[in-house]
Amino acid sequence: MKNLFLFCRAGFEKECAAEIQQRAGELNVGGFVKANNNDAYVVYQCFEDDAADTLVKQLPLDSLIFARQMFAASDLLVDLPENDRISPIVAALSDVSKAGEVRVETPDTNEAKELSAFCRKFTVPLRQHLKKSGSLLAQENPKRPIIHVCFIGPGRAYVGYSYSNNSSPHFMGIPRLKMAADAPSRSSLKLDEAFGQFVPKEEQEERIRSGMNSVDLGACPGGWTYQLVRRGMFVSAVDNGPMDEKLMETGQVKHYREDGFRFEPQRKNIYWLVCDMVEKPARVAELIEAWAINGWFKEAIFNLKLPMKSRYKEVTAILETMQTILKENGVTDFKVQCKHLYHDRDEVTVHLWLRPNTAWN
């Protein structure tokens, strides 16, 4: 297969396209992008047959900022007959053998999601035929490739596969999170999703645990503080504005009515630093850099608000500058990840982990 299909948020196709063009070039996989505004997906068409397999194997999905999910794809199947959509799809997947799962999906747009009910019904007979053809195992296997069938419109679909070790575990790359009734704001879901995105399940018990000390800069009214409290942490909530009363009643939160940019923690045994302030992204990055250079935290999650134009260029420039400044100031052992999360809008979420191979005392 020569195409790479990437899911993204509607309105961010240009950013996703610019990113995959650059990242594919770094792997010497030549090609060109096909993208339309508000389609919520991008297709990177490789010049060489089967080159998409190189990308789904060697380009880590977690290293892409704007792609939620990706899979190697056939050319677009069009005019699928209403009386037999299955046969052309099974034929297009003839080179896929013993996959462990099939997902029938759509892009994340209102128009495409009108096909959701059809996709659910269609999955059952398609699964049966794929098992008969040998493309799909009789029993689901989380270690085998995943077959993707993405309907972009009635009778029009991209089909292909991803590898389970380089793929989102979520349908369409979207985690299904529920808004807690007592959460102070919807922004709470951003940190909830970020923990799942940046901290593997098998490490969460060690890295996100009860009793840890944390700081929330720009905390009001407490959406992100809520997620820290829910996980049993003690929180220094820094904001001139008021905090949610129920959060304060937990006894786990100390409210500092201060400017987050001027706050200096009294305790230096802070594990988590979180920050979701409506500020220029470069200024927020400088703040996190200062905390990192001072060694005031172990892991940080923070949001960078995006400009209206050149969003991919701006984000990558800020992240590159951050890494340079940290290294120039003696902070050389760290890991940075960045993702445009489902619950993000005009922003991206960054994870900075200091000394990832050194245990926290």
Curated annotation (Swiss-Prot):
One Pfam short name: RLMM_N
Signal sequence bounds: none
Keywords annotated in UniProt: Cytoplasm, Methyltransferase, rRNA processing, S-adenosyl-L-methionine, Transferase
Reaction it catalyzes: cytidine(2498) in 23S rRNA + S-adenosyl-L-methionine = 2'-O-methylcytidine(2498) in 23S rRNA + S-adenosyl-L-homocysteine + H(+)
Compartment(s) where it occurs, according to its Swiss-Prot or TrEMBL record: Cytoplasm
Main localization, broad class: cytoplasm
Binding-site residues, S-adenosyl-L-methionine: 187, 220-223, 239, 259, 276
Source taxon at top rank: Bacteria
Role noted for this protein: Catalyzes the 2'-O-methylation at nucleotide C2498 in 23S rRNA.
Official protein name in the record: Ribosomal RNA large subunit methyltransferase M
Source organism: Shewanella baltica (strain OS155 / ATCC BAA-1091)
